Amino acid sequence: YTHTKDMQLYSGPVGMQTLSNAGKADATGVELEAKWRFAPGWSWDINGNVIRSEFTNDSELYHGNRVPFVPRYGAGSSVNGVIDTRYGALMPRLAVNLVGPHYFDGDNQLRQGTYATLDSSLGWQATERMNISVYVDNLFDRRYRTYGYMNGSSAVAQVNMGRTVGINTRIDFF
């Protein structure tokens, strides 16, 4: 449970927006997480959450509306491995992530529906202090809105970057 006072939201026409007090909001929810080590070096992780986040009676403009950018639910599942080799450990990972519906505005007019992404990575623990991994996030290039606002009578949205491919390197000096 979380109670927030003096929550602030952007309001006004595009280009002249200001922060304004949106009142109080309450959030209640539950999160669950489990891990199953089904074979040596391999695990299956699963997690989920359900959240109800609304503006309270104290909010004159948004009473009873859902708080922007708070998905109603989320879930994830991944298979993770550690494969020891003479050249260091290889760490494959495959994950699916589900994000529930949420709004971008206090009026609850601009909504992003539920979407899911599939992510993968392969890490290499070359030494105790060096790790290199390659990843592909959003493998199937699922498009969804990350932000939205009203511009006059038109709704405008920013779309995610789509599939992302990258390399992470970590070196611990101490």
Per-region residue spans from a language model:
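Hydrophobic, well-ordered secondary-structure elements that form the walls
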Residues: 32, 46, 79, 94, ...
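Short, glycine/charged-rich beta-strand-loop motifs at protein surfaces that mediate ligand recognition
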Residues: 106-111, 119-123
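Transmembrane beta-barrel architecture of outer membranes
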Residues: 17, 27-29, 72-76, 115-119, ...
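Flexible, surface-exposed loop regions and adjacent strand-edge segments
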Residues: 11-18, 60-66, 109-114, 148-157
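Gram-negative outer-membrane beta-barrel transporters
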Residues: 1-4, 14, 20-106
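C-terminal beta-signal and adjacent terminal beta-strands/loops
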Residues: 97-105, 124-174
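Short beta-strands and strand-coil junctions in structured, solvent-facing domains, enriched
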Residues: 5-6, 142
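Structural signature of outer-membrane beta-barrel channels/translocons
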Residues: 35-43, 80-86, 123-125, 129, ...
